[in-house]
């Protein structure tokens, strides 16, 4: 990888990780459309570390609160403050973690085609549009999350293992479908990203441990910085944009991309 490829792929990771457009799909598509070689495992590690750092930095105050209330809920064996939300993040991660580990090899080899990405981009784009429409018309949006909601959202998140689905997209979709407010939907979806990205990072590190690779430290450092900054800016921008215009710009983008990909594979 050269400097230009490093910047482009780190930007793709940082910009698409928290937008409902699928970072995994874009990281597959960019090398596919440009004939670049796949990025190294070491590069995957640093850009995931970058996006993880961004979301932790953005939600640092809330994360401290969640840890505090989670700890005291265990000690006192009762719900305290935001402890239910903390438990929700933990329990909502279990389904995708289990499915991801069980079907890891199949996902890595059988679900990376442009055709699958095209179908997932279109189908889950339409679903995101419906959920946004439903949420807009729902006059009784919930400001708290139930255990049933957590179970449904956690199961829905397993669909993010299909490239083109978008982890943030499917979790926000599920949140809106169960009636959560838009603010809580985005907040819960982004908090869920922390353990999920962490699990992905651990698995990549395990693979990297078993594969000796020569690395360019300066390019890796650049990838981390670009991914972290672009991810943080994206989080800030996305939250403000959603308040102003809703999800439709991303629905339109997904439908346009999906149609383009079908023309590409024909």
UniProtKB/Swiss-Prot annotation:
<feature type="transmembrane region" description="Helical">
    <location>
        <begin position="1"/>
        <end position="21"/>
    </location>
</feature>
<dbReference type="GO" id="GO:0009252">
    <property type="term" value="P:peptidoglycan biosynthetic process"/>
</dbReference>
<dbReference type="GO" id="GO:0071555">
    <property type="term" value="P:cell wall organization"/>
</dbReference>
<keyword id="KW-1133">Transmembrane helix</keyword>
<feature type="transmembrane region" description="Helical">
    <location>
        <begin position="83"/>
        <end position="103"/>
    </location>
</feature>
<keyword id="KW-0812">Transmembrane</keyword>
<dbReference type="GO" id="GO:0005886">
    <property type="term" value="C:plasma membrane"/>
</dbReference>
<comment type="similarity">
    <text>Belongs to the UppP family.</text>
</comment>
<feature type="transmembrane region" description="Helical">
    <location>
        <begin position="245"/>
        <end position="265"/>
    </location>
</feature>
<feature type="transmembrane region" description="Helical">
    <location>
        <begin position="219"/>
        <end position="239"/>
    </location>
</feature>
<dbReference type="GO" id="GO:0050380">
    <property type="term" value="F:undecaprenyl-diphosphatase activity"/>
</dbReference>
<keyword id="KW-0378">Hydrolase</keyword>
<dbReference type="GO" id="GO:0008360">
    <property type="term" value="P:regulation of cell shape"/>
</dbReference>
<keyword id="KW-0472">Membrane</keyword>
<feature type="transmembrane region" description="Helical">
    <location>
        <begin position="114"/>
        <end position="134"/>
    </location>
</feature>
<dbReference type="InterPro" id="IPR003824">
    <property type="entry name" value="UppP"/>
</dbReference>
<dbReference type="Pfam" id="PF02673">
    <property type="entry name" value="BacA"/>
</dbReference>
<feature type="transmembrane region" description="Helical">
    <location>
        <begin position="43"/>
        <end position="63"/>
    </location>
</feature>
<keyword id="KW-1003">Cell membrane</keyword>
<keyword id="KW-0046">Antibiotic resistance</keyword>
<keyword id="KW-0997">Cell inner membrane</keyword>
<keyword id="KW-0573">Peptidoglycan synthesis</keyword>
<keyword id="KW-0133">Cell shape</keyword>
<dbReference type="GO" id="GO:0046677">
    <property type="term" value="P:response to antibiotic"/>
</dbReference>
<feature type="transmembrane region" description="Helical">
    <location>
        <begin position="144"/>
        <end position="164"/>
    </location>
</feature>
<protein>
    <recommendedName>
        <fullName>Undecaprenyl-diphosphatase</fullName>
        <ecNumber>3.6.1.27</ecNumber>
    </recommendedName>
</protein>
<keyword id="KW-0961">Cell wall biogenesis/degradation</keyword>
<comment type="function">
    <text>Catalyzes the dephosphorylation of undecaprenyl diphosphate (UPP). Confers resistance to bacitracin.</text>
</comment>
<feature type="transmembrane region" description="Helical">
    <location>
        <begin position="186"/>
        <end position="206"/>
    </location>
</feature>
């Amino acid at each position: 990888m050269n400097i230009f490829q490093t910047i482009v792929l780190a930007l793709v990771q940082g910009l698409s990780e928290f937008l409902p457009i699928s970072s995994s799909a874009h990281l597959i598509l960019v090398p596919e459309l440009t004939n670049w070689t796949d990025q190294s495992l070491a590069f995957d590690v640093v850009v995931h570390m970058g996006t993880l750092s961004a979301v932790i930095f953005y939600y640092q105050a809330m994360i401290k609160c969640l840890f505090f209330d989670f700890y005291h809920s265990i000690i006192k064996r009762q719900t305290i403050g935001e402890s239910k939300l903390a438990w929700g993040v933990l329990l909502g991660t279990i389904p995708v973690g289990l499915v991801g580990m069980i079907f890891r090899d199949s996902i890595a080899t059988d679900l990376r085609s442009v055709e699958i990405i095209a179908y997932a981009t279109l189908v889950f784009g339409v679903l995101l549009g419906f959920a946004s429409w439903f949420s807009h018309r729902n006059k009784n949006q919930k400001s708290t999350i139930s255990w049933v909601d957590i179970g449904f959202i956690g199961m829905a998140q397993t669909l993010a293992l299909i490239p083109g689905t978008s982890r943030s997209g499917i979790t926000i979709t599920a949140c809106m479908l169960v009636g959560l407010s838009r603010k809580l939907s985005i907040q819960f979806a982004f908090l869920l990203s922390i353990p999920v990205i962490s699990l992905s990072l651990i698995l990549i590190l395990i693979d990297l441990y078993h594969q000796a690779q020569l690395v360019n430290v300066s390019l890796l450092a650049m990838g981390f910085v670009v991914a972290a900054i672009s991810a943080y800016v994206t989080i800030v921008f996305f939250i403000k944009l959603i308040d102003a215009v809703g999800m439709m710009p991303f629905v339109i983008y997904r439908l346009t991309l999906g149609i383009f990909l079908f023309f590409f594979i024909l």
